[in-house]
């Protein structure tokens, strides 16, 4: 299995979030430190990362192509370009540097599940078993419960939310322009491991842990 990490120099909601420090080290280096047992590829537009990634023997950082730069580019397009350039045939695990509490044991367990199954992909999720509502133009409507019949939450239907902690897949899955194939598995990840740094508030929560 190989690991793919897309890293932009600029971010939209948190300024320079990939370079923000946690315990004296930028988030992107925290991520690399967890994957010493794997070959890691970084797609980046950052000269800093292209230079400093050379400190890691198992890491290959390469410059993002001009037509793939910008906030509108899909991560799937980045992965397809990576797989094509390096002729990747192994399973790919894609992660983000903004999951600072990622545990390598979860990655190894997911990798093992894929090996033992006939699944073409596995992705991380949050389990949700609460009373959910949806806001519509005409008002609000329940999703998974009947407000006129109060049930205990443990009796409600279970929903799962992709949390982007990781996506693991065989390269041919990308033919559908997705990271999730036709026979996927889900992998539950609980708080705080599934924390994703997407706002300044998230960053403050991380620091306070």
Per-region residue spans from a language model:
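Hydrophobic helical membrane-anchoring modules
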Residues: 187-188, 193-209
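Short phosphate-binding loop-to-helix
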Residues: 47-93, 101-109
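N-terminal glycine-rich phosphate-binding loop and ensuing alpha1 helix
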Residues: 2-44
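Catalytic phosphate/metal-binding cores of nucleic-acid and nucleotide-processing enzymes, i.e., regions
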Residues: 1-2, 88
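Short, high-confidence coil segments that cap the C-terminus of an alpha-helix
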Residues: 37, 88-89, 116-120
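Short, polar loop motifs at secondary-structure junctions
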Residues: 44-49, 172-173
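Conserved core of the sugar-phosphate nucleotidyltransferase
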Residues: 100-192
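Histidine-centered beta-alpha loop that forms part of the nucleotide-sugar donor binding/catalytic region
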Residues: 8, 66, 126-127
